[in-house]
């Protein structure tokens, strides 16, 4: 059974697809999510303002901004609107000040953890192929930042994923 639509969104990093084309496609995908009553997994890279503007056009569509790279201010705006923030191994990197700040400061019930496989492997595996077996490193880092245990983070993020994707416990 389909649980979400994604990965959809905007990526202005390489500029290989015109921004207007990306925005049009994103709006069409958000409209489909609304029609099907499904959450979305949003990829947004270097397109923070446009990404927020478009999700605001669809207030009844919710989801996760995966592999989050935006500011704490934007994360707070997304959380206010009912969105989740996805963290990858980036949060373990020494130079990941923004990701750390967001992970420390948004509500635990809005955090998801992920691989973004095959990219974004956490320290000490940075630069290698990522896979699901490395997600505990992400949980451990967020736990350390928040003064919790990795088990606390695992339990909370599992519940968050079940809630977002409407998965019954035990399935």
Spell out what each predicted region is.
Residues 32, 133-171:
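Mid-to-C-terminal alpha-helical segments outside catalytic/metal-binding sites
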Residues 1-81, 93, 101-102, 106, ...:
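Divalent metal-binding pocket/active-site signature
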Residues 110:
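Rossmann-fold dehydrogenase core element
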Residues 82-96:
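His/Asp/Glu-enriched short active-site or ligand-binding loop at hydrolase and phosphoryl-transfer sites
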Residues 100-101, 140:
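Active-site phosphate/pyrophosphate- and oxyanion-stabilizing loops and adjacent acidic/basic residues
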Residues 116:
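Conserved beta/loop motifs at nucleotide-recognition and modification sites
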Residues 120-122:
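Amphipathic alpha-helical segments at domain termini/boundaries
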């Amino acid at each position: 059974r389909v649980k979400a639509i994604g990965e959809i969104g905007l990526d202005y990093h390489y500029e290989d697809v015109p921004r207007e084309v990306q925005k049009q496609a994103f709006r069409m995908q958000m409209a489909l999510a609304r029609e099907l009553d499904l959450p979305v997994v949003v990829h947004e890279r270097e397109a923070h303002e446009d990404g927020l503007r478009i999700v605001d056009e669809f207030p009844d569509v919710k989801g996760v901004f995966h592999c989050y790279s935006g500011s704490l201010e934007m994360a707070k705006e997304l959380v206010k609107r009912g969105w989740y923030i996805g963290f990858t191994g980036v949060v373990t990197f020494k130079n990941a000040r923004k990701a750390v700040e967001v992970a420390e400061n948004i509500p635990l019930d809005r955090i998801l953890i992920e691989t973004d496989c095959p990219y974004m492997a956490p320290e000490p595996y940075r630069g290698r192929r990522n896979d699901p077996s490395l997600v505990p490193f992400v949980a451990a880092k967020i736990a350390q930042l928040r003064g919790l245990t990795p088990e606390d983070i695992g339990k909370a993020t599992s519940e968050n994923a079940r809630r977002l994707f409407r998965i019954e416990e035990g399935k």
